[in-house]
């Protein structure tokens, strides 16, 4: 059996894998156990009551977290004309059409989000094999193919997270950093869960959000008691 590291031993002693923690206790534990030499992200895994094998039950979308993610996001925009000027004014890091596509083909992928206006998809479509596997391909379902590229840029910069269930019906996302306050992390988590509830497929029956777990980049996961959260959709 592999020898446990000191960090893993501490986590095993502190975290009860059979317990659901109230959000206050969960965040306090996450902060206590986040001892890496960098500011760790706080990640969430949400088990949904869906059959991921059925396309009409898959959940996909995007939402802007009220307190952002703590990450600096570089945004590339495929567009032209007035939209290009608007994207630049909104804070886009890279704006272009064929010239930007050539950069991508050369492997220059120094961006985290790709946005495109509908008229630019003829150019972006040629980059599917490069952008697709990296989760960067623009898609209207998550608001990254849109005539309003300026708004999309602002959302991306403000802390928008995109979500999509995996083959096990689990959504993985980030809700901030360990140096966020408890209130900021709680508000971000509640905002994400409200967005997921609104995205519930009509064919999904029974309990939709079955389990919510929080973890840090280098830490163990812990289940969160949903009763400690306010996830009533406005």
Swiss-Prot record:
Q: What is the lineage of its organism?
A: Bacteria, Pseudomonadati, Pseudomonadota, Gammaproteobacteria, Aeromonadales
Q: Could you tell me the Gene Ontology terms of the biological process aspect for this record?
A: regulation of translation; translation
Q: Quick one: which gene encodes this? A: rplA
Q: Which organism is it from?
A: Tolumonas auensis (strain DSM 9187 / NBRC 110442 / TA 4)
Give the Gene Ontology MF terms in alphabetical order: rRNA binding; structural constituent of ribosome; tRNA binding
This protein's record includes keyword Lipid biosynthesis = no
Which InterPro entries does the UniProt record give? Ribosom_uL1_bac-type (IPR005878), Ribosomal_uL1 (IPR002143), Ribosomal_uL1-like (IPR023674), Ribosomal_uL1/biogenesis (IPR028364), Ribosomal_uL1_3-a/b-sand (IPR016095), Ribosomal_uL1_CS (IPR023673)
> What is this protein's record name?
Large ribosomal subunit protein uL1
- Keywords linked to the UniProt accession: Repressor, Ribonucleoprotein, Ribosomal protein, RNA-binding, rRNA-binding, Translation regulation, tRNA-binding
Q: Which NCBIfam families match?
A: rplA_bact (TIGR01169)
